[in-house]
């Protein structure tokens, strides 16, 4: 069923026993329900900035936009806990070369972005002033482009308010999905919603997106140090060197704000307790080959 409300109605009536598209307005009433499942997904919800636009030429502007976002509020209030706050690009579940958590090892074990939002907001205001735009004065209106599915519209409205706290005027441009992806790919935007779900758990699968010339590099991020680190990671046979190179690449990406991580994906779904033997993977798939339905 393409209509999540119709699917939910069918689930409630017992016509179906499993739905993966739960209407977001129903989530508050489902908290604590054993049939409502939320599990991590190897993916990150992030913002792409069109780095060919002069408005984003100064890294301090990009940092200010990132710091002005209260990620905990976005993930746990706007997204109702169905996402997790993202303080770096590569989230939980991605595996370092020694089998440990790449996320836990990032930046010496410290978050790239402080979880102290009040301090972040003050720093954002100062960075914007340092870039020559005190209280947002002189910075052109930012157009934020997204499609209208799930939480995308409420996130857009939040960003309009959050960046407004910096004195930045933001216009929200909501387009149909069929138009959205080509617009983003062709650079027909200023800031746009983006995201990636991993094909496999090696962090290069996420970081490769930002290599110069990558077809999925919608923001056109290009940095020689980043590219060199990714090339080192791809060519070395030494696992410790490869790990160091991948972490160096993420360090550069985060320092240069090649994108703005917002939240880590989780999958959420409704599954009747009558269903047994199926499982969910962090790649966003459900496996039903050993499933059964108890009568």
What is each model feature region?
Residues 27-38, 186-189, 202-217, 272-276:
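Ligand-binding "clamshell"
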Residues 29, 35-50, 52, 56-98, 155, 213-227, ...:
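Periplasmic-binding protein-like
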Residues 84-130, 149-153:
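Structural transition elements
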